[in-house]
Amino acid sequence: MADKLRTPPSTESANGRHPSEPEKQWTDTTLSNALANSPERPIGAPTGTNLDEHGQARYTTISGRPVRRLYTPADLPPDWNYDQYLGYPGQPPYTRGIHATGYRGKLWTMRQFSGFASPEETNQRYKELLAHGAGGLSVAFDLPTLMGYDSDHPFSEGEVGKCGVAIDSLEDMEILFDGIRLQDITTSMTINSPASILWAMYLVVAEKQGADWKKISGTLQNDVLKEYLAQKEYIYPPAPSMRLVIDTFEFGSKFTPRFNTISISGYHIREAGSTALQELAFTIYDGIEYVEWALRRGLDIDEFGPRLSFFFNAHNDFFEEIAKYRAARKIWYRLMRDRFHAKQERTRLMRFHTQTAGVSLTAQQPLNNIARVAIQALAAVLGGTQSLHTDSYDEALALPTAEAARISLRTQQIIAYESGVANTIDPLGGSYFVERATLDMEDGAFDYFEKLDTLGGMVNAIEKGFPQKEIAEASYQYQRAVEAREKVIVGVNEFTVDEEPPHILYIDESIREKQSAKLSLLRAQRSNDEVRRTLDALKRAAAQEPRVKPDGSISDANTMPYIIEAVRAYATVGEICEALREVYGAYEETSVA
């Protein structure tokens, strides 16, 4: 199947080049003379450690893909033509973007990921970001919330409010968005295993504000597959986790048509050490898996498909990243059209958010990270992202200070309003280097798709450890190259200095006690009988097999309505997750040999 969906004909390797006579003459004369007089600079530090078997410098991308000295028409397929391989923005195959006017019509959304300590403190940060021009909000939750534990659970000790905001109940969500009209903004929530619970809280807060669910918009990350692949913040086994995701697809297509019910995330796969190609391939194949599970439920692809969104990383290798984004749109279009037979054009569009690479930030000389983030953000923009988060320079050390967060937002604004890159669409389109890299990304992704198809899909591949092994090997090879100084990390393995530790944000250790006291008061004041009733109803629904009804209405076993009722009764995140654990059990990863 995968091979049939490639761009015809399958792209040629660099070994199949047929240079023109002028290129041959240039190689034999101008280039040859230049190399004789001045050899190319070595790669690596300090005198060149990245050499091939002939002692020549080996130029590669960060992912290790070879980079030629020069790209010409000879690096493209012999039948390469503009209409077949590129097309126009806003038209298939969307290589050049999904909007006909690019950023001239609308700039990307500047969506800064933020959340720390208490809901009260994060609420103030959100108001600051909105006041400084942020176009949307992106919620970072703390580790206990991500893992489905309340702040007063023993497992939560030492982690409450550390890497995001602590949300235990609807009361916390009400505080988080106090004074912020949810119908007037878009919100992205980075939450996965407990995603349906936090989304239910968001919907109830919107309801209490008088908002129409059909008019609110935002994005729920809700990508459990990448938890097994990379981030490891899973709760339930894969099958019931997938069932919960499809419940949100079904519910969202009926009641929240403007809300993206998933953000299929390559970001964390890249942060775990994958190459750019692996990020692209595994992310899109995760999307394939979600679509297939939804279709088996009986959902209509043209109902839930338009609400599928993606989330990619922006790493340091400028052109490799741009090629990745361009290839992603092209691949998704072809898959939705030819593999899943989506009829509506909007179902075939890939919309994606991008975040600059947290893993690239260095604790040493942290101000250097401002430059790294700017380069990464520019790549995301030139690749056509719909929204963007720029990391703060101090995030290798702690959650960002208010000043660092403001600089990261200003970085986007300078790119948008001062650089001129938003004035024309896909300005790197037609570059022989970029087009060759885009084709290579596409071809490499389909190679991975064939392997994953053979393994029986992503869930089966995860259980067999295939993608985990691929990521682990790529991570090892990258770290080996850094330690061998084949790859230079400025300020880490080259150009180092002694420096004073910077000012960083510290989280008040009393946050756990405050959240625990709030929980005690909540449990004393709510109707605990109502909490028990709603949780029992949820467990009964979770134990049933959901199927779409003949009239198209949602299944009686869809868990979302039951979770919403539990949230309205002020059941906590931990209580709802524990109810589902009683039905589904907890997942324990086996070691991958």
Language model features with spans:
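Short acidic (Asp/Glu) and glycine-rich catalytic loops that position anionic groups and cofactors
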Residues: 106, 152-155, 183, 225-227, ...
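Short beta-alpha connecting loops at secondary-structure transitions
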Residues: 158-162, 187, 226-236, 269-275, ...
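Catalytic alpha/beta active-site cores
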Residues: 2-315, 320-321, 339-342, 346-353, ...
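Generic, well-ordered alpha-helical scaffold segments in large soluble proteins
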Residues: 116, 125-132, 170-180, 201-205, ...
